[in-house]
Amino acid sequence: MRTDLFDFELPAGSIALRPASPRDSARMLVVQPGSGVRDQQVSDLPEWLRPGDQLVVNDTRVIAAQLHGRRIGREAEPRIDATLIKRLDGSRWSALVRPARKLMAGDIVRLGNEGRVCFLGHLDARVESKGEEGEVTFAFSFHGPMLDQAIAELGSTPLPPYIASKRAPDDRDASDYQTMFATHEGAVAAPTAGLHFTPEIETALRGRGVGLHRITLHVGAGTFLPVKVDDTAGHRMHSEWGAISTETADALNAARSRGGRIVAVGTTSLRLLESAADDDGRIKPFTGETAIFITPGHRFRAVDILMTNFHLPRSTLFMLVSAFSGLETMKQAYAHAISAGYRFYSYGDACLLFPERAGA
């Protein structure tokens, strides 16, 4: 499909720079193809679900992936800004670096603002290789848990570019940019639909007989990358690591066999569930990488309802929601959201999407 079909104009003032407080006071646009839209709040979510429905959340935890430092060992020592994007092994990460032109293979970058050091000393990273568009492979001076602790001490919250370009990260973001489910460290971007949840709404959902299950997908920075090709067929999707336990897969399959619906909280949960489902819609245990790219025409096998935020134009995520609820439906829903003052992107409001009906 042509990527310009997924374009739309978004006023700059629609981008949320802080989350709603309390989290479940965010607005929620309910989209039912063929039945229009309804303006609600996230706290209304239990009313839209039935006993036996199963919510699936992503329990990944965002690491302090934004690092600053200087190149050392040559005459000039330019400042280097790096965002970790994917762990390769116990001591190596892929990172997006600015300015990448200042680095070559073999260079050493000493990380930490103004000579700041971590508990083990300096954190040095050797440039192992350079890729396209500012991507480099770093080989760090520490390994395993020691490297993780050094990154946690020296790094900061990796805010999305549409927020970071307008303000610097601060102490509030360290908690605001984590979901209440965040457990397994490894993401460099939050699974933002989960940011809307509070203990109160979890209690209300359980009281209604809705189950809640955790899966893990370590969200990468590729989630923010625009689709630069003219046709979706030419786009190379980023891969991310995920896991679904046998216990969770069995529980979801059993609930669905009894008539319960699977409600994916976020596109990350949906992508992992769809990656793990067979042709009959049964979810299999899963551990590994997924690079699933969902566009209109995809047959959804594992997910019945999707709760998600509002996404960027021409993004793979807007393509995904258009596949789920229909392109024209989503364009109309987004036009309504913009005119009604909904807040967009990571810290913004939510949508509750129902699927496009077959033959619609």
Swiss-Prot record:
Q: Which UniProt keywords apply?
A: Cytoplasm, Queuosine biosynthesis, S-adenosyl-L-methionine, Transferase
Q: What Gene Ontology molecular-function terms does this entry list?
A: S-adenosylmethionine:tRNA ribosyltransferase-isomerase activity
Question: Which Gene3D superfamilies does its entry note?
Answer: QueA-like
- Which GO CC annotations does the UniProt entry carry? cytoplasm
Enzyme Commission code(s) on record? 2.4.99.17
Q: What is its main location?
A: cytoplasm
Question: Which of the seven top EC classes does this enzyme belong to?
Answer: transferase
| Cellular location(s) | Cytoplasm
Q: Does the keyword Ribonucleoprotein apply?
A: no
Pathway as given in its UniProt record: tRNA modification; tRNA-queuosine biosynthesis
What is any one GO biological process for this UniProt entry?
queuosine biosynthetic process
**Entry-linked InterPro entries:** QueA, QueA_dom1, QueA_dom2, QueA_sf
Query: Catalysed reaction per UniProt?
Result: 7-aminomethyl-7-carbaguanosine(34) in tRNA + S-adenosyl-L-methionine = epoxyqueuosine(34) in tRNA + adenine + L-methionine + 2 H(+)
What is the recorded function of this protein according to its Swiss-Prot or TrEMBL entry?
Answer: Transfers and isomerizes the ribose moiety from AdoMet to the 7-aminomethyl group of 7-deazaguanine (preQ1-tRNA) to give epoxyqueuosine (oQ-tRNA).
Assembly and partners?
Answer: Monomer.
What protein family does this chain belong to? Belongs to the QueA family.
Q: Which NCBIfam families match?
A: PRK00147.1, queA
- Protein name, per record: S-adenosylmethionine:tRNA ribosyltransferase-isomerase
Organism for this UniProt entry: Nitrobacter winogradskyi (strain ATCC 25391 / DSM 10237 / CIP 104748 / NCIMB 11846 / Nb-255)
User: Gene for this protein?
Assistant: queA
